[in-house]
């Protein structure tokens, strides 16, 4: 039986140090796929802080710097002396090499893309893998002399030292990126590191995660009360059920109908969470309040801030009617934390659960999902006994339709998005594609175009259909929806939604785009 670990340090885990690679979150995600808990930390972490985490293994990510740059990212060198396994990837391998007095130089030509490597010495890292394999390279420097005590484990035509290992000290490095899907046996290599080198059992599951989180919530909250920002989306709904299992009626859910919800959403949320789970939900009609604040505002960042601030002020108003409320719960995910920026990465956009809170907020935050990716949240919801109708609902941002209407928000524009999105969801479900497509929705860009309807000229709105496939939301590809399904969606939207004469399909992946338009 799983032992509830109130002390987080008891849990086996692999820490990924962030040196600025665009792929570092993928490393964390891949390790978790093997049933091993992993999380990302800045490269500035001290050895004392690292010891407090009690990691089973450490991975140094890649990064854009050269190890010889004046301002290159460094790690606390004492981490190398902790006596636990370390894997350096790309820049991480070069950092390990220079620390142990090996030699790194600028490559004559930068190498980006697929490459063939030959495994010279399998070591534990390459155990059971083919001698020749395709990997993904992305580097401008390379190791030209391995440190004393290390062996060369892999080579490639343009990178004579593509892998190194010191088996005695359990130190390993690879010049390529095993976390990227283009590295054909990358997953197997990372699994070797996690299970064979680090000795992890691979028993991290949503069952033990929920038990640990329930125990933590009970310990943190005690006999106090918690307010939950219930948006109606998957994340906040799962948070609500998790916290309700931990503290029961000490949880009060504040469901704010801000006028930015999907069609029929308010009624569905109340019927499911209040009716089936007997949760205490206060519904607040704040449509006019939000629309007044958003009037004339076009900038997406400003809209996010206004919506985030107004949410908190609504909660303040409701909290004043309750006694003993000290905590605010949110459905912040790990991807939200990462996308809102770390010490080594540029902020992509301030997230509604991360960067939209006022400085004078009166509550302590509880974010029990902030170490999980979206697919893990769905798995947790299923583990908690939630119905598929909630667990597999389409992801919905905290600012709601406020960021799916580009530019200024009006009632007319909101109705267009509501009705078109409803049609899209109906047709995707009819086609049996709702589990195959990770996320799909409509958005209203601030674009009007000329059209012909009946015998007359029109000058009306354009609706964008956005649909992507993904595993965890960190990267995404546009979904290949069959043409006949797209045709049905387009015909219905143009004919059934007022003031729309054009439908376009977004075929951009993430990156370079994000999933949402704002």
UniProtKB/Swiss-Prot annotation:
Per the record, its GO cellular-component terms are: cytosol
Name of the protein in question? GMP synthase [glutamine-hydrolyzing]
Q: What pathway is it annotated to?
A: Purine metabolism; GMP biosynthesis; GMP from XMP (L-Gln route): step 1/1
| Positions of transmembrane segments | none
Gene3D superfamilies associated with the record: 3.30.300.10, 3.40.50.880, HUPs
Q: Binding residues for ATP, per the UniProt record? A: 231-237
Q: Which PROSITE patterns match?
A: GATASE_TYPE_1 (PS51273), GMPS_ATP_PPASE (PS51553)
Q: Where is the Glutamine amidotransferase type-1 domain?
A: 13-203
| Cited CDD domains | GATase1_GMP_Synthase, GMP_synthase_C
Q: Which leading EC class covers this enzyme?
A: ligase
Which superkingdom, per the lineage?
Answer: Bacteria
Give the active-site positions.
90, 177, 179
Question: From which organism does this entry originate?
Answer: Listeria welshimeri serovar 6b (strain ATCC 35897 / DSM 20650 / CCUG 15529 / CIP 8149 / NCTC 11857 / SLCC 5334 / V8)
């Amino acid at each position: 039986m799983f032992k509830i670990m109130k002390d987080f340090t008891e849990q086996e885990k692999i820490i990924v140090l962030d040196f600025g690679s665009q792929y570092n979150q993928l490393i964390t995600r891949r390790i978790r796929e093997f049933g091993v808990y992993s999380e990302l930390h800045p490269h500035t972490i001290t050895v004392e802080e690292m010891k407090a985490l009690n990691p089973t293994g450490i991975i140094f990510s890649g990064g854009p710097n050269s190890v010889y740059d004046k301002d290159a990212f460094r790690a606390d060198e004492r981490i190398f002396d902790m006596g636990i396994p370390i894997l350096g990837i790309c820049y991480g391998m070069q950092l390990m090499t220079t620390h142990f007095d090996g030699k790194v130089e600028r490559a004559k030509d930068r190498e980006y893309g697929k490459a063939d490597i030959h495994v010279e010495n399998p070591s534990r890292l390459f155990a059971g893998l083919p001698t020749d394999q395709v990997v993904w390279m992305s580097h401008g420097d390379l190791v030209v002399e391995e440190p004393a005590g290390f062996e060369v484990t892999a080579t490639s035509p343009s990178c004579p030292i593509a892998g190194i290992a010191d088996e005695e000290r359990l130190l390993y490095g690879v010049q390529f990126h095993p976390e990227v899907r283009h590295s054909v046996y990358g997953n197997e290599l990372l699994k070797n590191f996690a299970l064979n080198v680090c000795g992890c059992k691979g028993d991290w599951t949503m069952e033990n995660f929920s038990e640990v989180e329930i125990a933590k919530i009970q310990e943190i909250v005690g006999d106090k009360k918690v307010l939950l920002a219930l948006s109606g989306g998957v994340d906040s709904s799962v948070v609500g059920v998790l916290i309700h299992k931990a503290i029961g009626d000490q949880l009060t859910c504040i469901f704010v109908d801000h006028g930015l919800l999907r069609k029929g959403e308010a009624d569905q949320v109340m019927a499911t969470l209040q009716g089936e789970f007997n949760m205490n939900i206060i519904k607040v009609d704040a449509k006019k309040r939000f629309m007044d604040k958003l009037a004339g505002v076009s900038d997406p960042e400003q809209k996010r801030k206004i919506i985030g601030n107004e949410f908190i002020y609504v909660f303040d108003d409701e909290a004043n009617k309750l006694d003993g409320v000290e905590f605010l719960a949110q459905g912040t995910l790990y991807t939200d934390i990462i996308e809102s920026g770390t010490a080594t990465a540029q902020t992509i956009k301030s997230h509604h659960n991360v960067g939209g809170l006022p400085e004078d907020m009166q509550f302590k935050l509880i974010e029990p999902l902030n170490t999980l990716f979206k697919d893990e949240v769905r798995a947790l919801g299923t583990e908690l006994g939630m119905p598929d109708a909630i667990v597999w609902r389409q992801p919905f941002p905290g600012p709601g339709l406020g960021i799916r209407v580009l530019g200024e928000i009006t009632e007319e524009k909101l109705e267009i998005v509501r009705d078109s999105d409803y049609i899209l969801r109906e047709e995707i479900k009819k086609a049996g594609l709702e589990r195959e497509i990770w996320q799909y929705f409509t958005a209203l860009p601030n674009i009007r175009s000329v059209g012909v309807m009946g015998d007359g000229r029109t000058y009306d709105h354009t609706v964008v259909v956005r649909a992507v496939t993904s595993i965890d939301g960190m990267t995404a590809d546009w979904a290949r929806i069959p043409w006949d399904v797209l045709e049905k969606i387009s015909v219905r939207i143009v004919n059934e939604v007022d003031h729309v004469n054009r439908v376009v399909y977004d075929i951009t992946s993430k990156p370079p785009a994000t999933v949402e338009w704002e």
